[in-house]
Swiss-Prot record:
Molecular function as annotated in GO: quinone binding; tetrahydroxynaphthalene reductase activity
Alphabetized UniProt keyword annotations: Melanin biosynthesis, NADP, Oxidoreductase
First and last residue of the signal peptide: none
Induction, per UniProt: Expression is positively regulazed by the cluster-specific transcription factor pfmaF.
Residues annotated as binding NADP(+): I36, D82, N109, Y173, K177, I206, T208
Reported phenotype of the disruption mutant: Abolishes the production of scytalone.
InterPro entries: NAD(P)-bd_dom_sf, Sc_DH/Rdtase_CS, SDR_fam
Swiss-Prot/TrEMBL catalytic activity: scytalone + NADP(+) = naphthalene-1,3,6,8-tetrol + NADPH + H(+)
Annotated SMART domains: PKS_KR
UniProt-recorded name of the protein: Tetrahydroxynaphthalene reductase PfmaG
Lineage: Eukaryota, Fungi, Dikarya, Ascomycota, Pezizomycotina
Family listed: Belongs to the short-chain dehydrogenases/reductases (SDR) family.
One GO BP: fatty acid biosynthetic process
Length: 277
């Protein structure tokens, strides 16, 4: 990869045309009204992509992201869809295609994290988690394979929890994400006929509202109600870079994967944790 290409992918770029490598590209990002999805959309928008900002219920946060993207020169829209429902996923892609005419990048980010003692998991809770985290991502990938332009990109979202050991009461969530890693490897094969790549990200230690609610579980000796700064300090010490991650960190990784230079990365699960556990 050339130095100039690396600069374009990884820097905080101004919105000038010479630094907009994704101008003319369209990215559909599920669950992008907040958190990691929002961070991905903003990084893609900085680089010229038009974004479909998906939300499940409230349009407020999604519309705020659209407004932020407009300031960056990105012509984006907010579309509602409950990703746990395959019919909603199909309709989301159809609406996006009707608006833009094509989709180049599909980033499946919607998800939920739960902690529940295994003996207390009900069939209803199991279905709720797997319908969103697992089945939803399968049908995002399926529709992306059907509708994305040749040479496009599909990115699914796993979690470092899928490979971690020693975390109690986490089988339901970890299992829902581990399945996604299998999807990425298999879809990469089937997407090859359209030169579409498929990879999965396994983020860890990324500060979002979900992080604020749940990260105490990952800190040795952590407890509910623990001061968030204490949690951040504890997790930072578990990372060689001595910090927690941000949604922008994941957004920049996505920009690398969807770039022309990222084509040879395919069927992989990328652990995105700054080297931390």
């Amino acid at each position: 990869m050339s130095p100039s290409a690396i600069h374009n992918i990884t820097s905080d770029l101004p919105s000038s045309q010479q630094h907009r490598p994704f101008a003319g590209k369209v990215a559909l990002i599920t669950g992008s009204g907040r958190g990691i999805g929002r961070g991905i959309a903003l990084e893609l928008g900085k680089r010229g992509a038009s974004c479909i900002i998906n939300y499940a219920k409230s349009a407020g946060a999604a519309n705020e992201v659209v407004a932020e993207l407009a300031k960056l020169g990105s012509k984006s829209i907010a579309l509602q869809a409950d990703i746990s429902k395959p019919a909603d996923v199909a309709a989301l892609f159809e609406k996006a295609l009707k608006h833009y005419g094509h989709i180049d990048f599909a980033i499946s980010n919607s998800g939920m994290e739960v902690w529940c003692e295994e003996t207390e998991v009900t069939p209803e809770l199991f279905d709720q988690v797997f319908n969103l985290n697992t089945r939803g991502q399968f049908f995002v990938a399926q529709n992306a394979l059907k509708h994305c332009s040749e040479g496009g990109r599909i990115i699914l979202t796993s979690s470092i929890a899928a490979q971690m050991t020693g975390i109690p009461n986490h089988a339901l969530y970890a299992g829902s994400k581990a399945a996604v890693e299998g999807f990425a490897r298999s879809f990469a094969v089937d997407c090859g006929r359209k030169r579409i790549t498929c990879n999965a990200l396994a983020p860890g230690g990324i500060q979002t509202d979900m992080f604020d609610e749940n990260s105490w579980h990952y800190v040795p000796g952590g407890y509910q109600g623990m001061n968030i700064d204490t949690i951040k300090d504890g997790l930072a010490k578990m990372c060689p870079l001595n910090r927690v991650g941000t949604p922008a960190d994941i957004g920049k990784i996505v920009c690398m994967l969807v770039s022309d230079e990222g084509e040879w990365i395919n069927g992989q699960v990328l652990r995105c944790s700054g080297g931390g556990v």
